[in-house]
Amino acid sequence: MPLIPMVIEQTSRGERAFDIYSRLLKDRIVFIGSAIDDETANLLIAQLLFLESEDPDKDINFYINSPGGKVSAGMAIYDTMQYIKSDIATVCIGHAASMGAFLLAAGAKGKRFSLPNSRIMIHQPMGGAQGQASDIAIQAKEILRMKDILNQILAHHTGKPLEQIQVDTDRDFFMSGEEAKAYGIVDHVITDRSDLDKLEKPQEA
């Protein structure tokens, strides 16, 4: 298990210690830096719901550095992003692949960012099947169903024709930040915090 850094802050009552993720949460920042599984999804969903309950009219900044992961876990995060009232600004740092790229594209329109050296990759869902032939057929049918759903949602968020999404996701499709911008997965490629700061200022006015 990786070591989680602690942050010490001075308060009127003395020193207070936070783990780094709790401290980021105070600034309405959530971060995923691993593969997406059920545990990761549950933690992230809880954070999103908490931040919405704190202030539904204030943006949430969602930083993504993930190779992707379990489709059902990613879809649970996606549905929560669409469900809550708060706009979610997504930021790719490092790489966003598979479900990571899917969640990156699912941010609020105009508030989806990539750092300049990030890599983004989309592809079709993968799955292994074993057991009796009838069981394998059922699992294959479910994978095809999820593929269609994911492609339709990606087409919605990128503005690309569904036919193009189907072709591009048939194999691993890698993009730079600028290429992801042209594709419609992100809206801006940023090198510093100025774009995010400009985004936050109107809310404070």
Curated annotation (Swiss-Prot):
Its EC number is 3.4.21.92. Gene3D superfamilies: 2-enoyl-CoA Hydratase, Chain A, domain 1 (3.90.226.10). The active site is at S98, H123. It comes from the Bacteria. Signal peptide: none annotated. One of its GO terms (cellular component) is endopeptidase Clp complex. It is an enzyme of class 3 (hydrolase). GO terms for biological process: protein quality control for misfolded or incompletely synthesized proteins. It is found in: Cytoplasm. GO terms for molecular function: ATP-dependent peptidase activity; ATPase binding; serine-type endopeptidase activity. Pfam families: CLP_protease. Keywords: Cytoplasm, Hydrolase, Protease, Serine protease. InterPro entries: ClpP (IPR001907), ClpP/crotonase-like_dom_sf (IPR029045), ClpP/TepA (IPR023562), ClpP_His_AS (IPR033135), ClpP_Ser_AS (IPR018215). It catalyses: Hydrolysis of proteins to small peptides in the presence of ATP and magnesium. alpha-casein is the usual test substrate. In the absence of ATP, only oligopeptides shorter than five residues are hydrolyzed (such as succinyl-Leu-Tyr-|-NHMec, and Leu-Tyr-Leu-|-Tyr-Trp, in which cleavage of the -Tyr-|-Leu- and -Tyr-|-Trp bonds also occurs). PROSITE patterns: CLP_PROTEASE_HIS (PS00382), CLP_PROTEASE_SER (PS00381). Belongs to the peptidase S14 family. Fourteen ClpP subunits assemble into 2 heptameric rings which stack back to back to give a disk-like structure with a central cavity, resembling the structure of eukaryotic proteasomes. Cleaves peptides in various proteins in a process that requires ATP hydrolysis. Has a chymotrypsin-like activity. Plays a major role in the degradation of misfolded proteins. This is ATP-dependent Clp protease proteolytic subunit.
